[in-house]
């Protein structure tokens, strides 16, 4: 599977019932969007394996899924906690100024004074805006280990260059 780049979009939870259904935890922005991205791959024993979605539905407020070949509780239990991934090629193209989180992780962050703030390790959703979690360089002049920088395009984030994996921000290095 070396030619494919897989992105995690969710995770299987515990079994539901005796007919092979599993709870599903979607990490897509809109919960049901996970079903728009097909085919799915499950990470089993460290390897991505294709899997076919047979059916899905809501049970109370939870999503539950039925996967092909998972016809009883025992076979479903083998898939519990498996990550769900999709090939990056199934994601739609974004407009200028919009980015997928996986594109931003690993980017070097520099401020307008050319100070290297560190590397984006993850993003957080706060409700009002996304936040870059930046691991500071080991010899940070301000003694920082981590910085939280709001991803406010044009206000704070001045430029994103995915070709060079750099994000330029208007942010004081002391914060």
Swiss-Prot record:
BP term (GO), one: rRNA processing
Keywords: Chaperone, Cytoplasm, Ribosome biogenesis, rRNA processing
Coiled coil stretches, renumbered: none
Species of origin: Actinobacillus pleuropneumoniae serotype 5b (strain L20)
A single MF term (Gene Ontology): ribosome binding
Subunit structure: Binds ribosomal protein uS19.
Protein name (database record): Ribosome maturation factor RimM
Compartment(s) of residence: Cytoplasm
Top-level division of the source organism's lineage: Bacteria
């Amino acid at each position: 599977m070396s030619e494919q780049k897989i992105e995690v979009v969710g995770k299987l939870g515990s079994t539901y019932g005796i007919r092979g259904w599993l709870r599903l935890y979607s990490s897509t922005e809109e919960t049901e969007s996970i079903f728009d991205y097909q085919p799915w791959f499950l990470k089993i024993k460290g390897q991505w394996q294709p899997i076919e979605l047979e059916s899905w539905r809501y049970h109370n407020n939870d999503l539950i899924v039925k996967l092909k070949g998972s016809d009883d509780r025992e076979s479903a239990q083998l898939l519990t906690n498996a990550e769900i991934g999709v090939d990056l090629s199934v994601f739609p193209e974004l407009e200028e100024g919009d980015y997928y989180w996986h594109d931003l992780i690993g980017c070097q962050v520099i401020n307008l004074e050319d100070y290297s703030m560190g590397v984006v390790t993850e993003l957080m959703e706060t409700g009002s805006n996304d936040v870059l979690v930046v691991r500071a360089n080991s010899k940070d002049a301000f003694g920082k280990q981590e910085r939280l920088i709001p991803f406010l395009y044009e206000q704070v984030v001045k430029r994103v260059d995915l070709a060079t994996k750099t994000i330029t921000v208007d942010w004081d290095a002391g914060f």
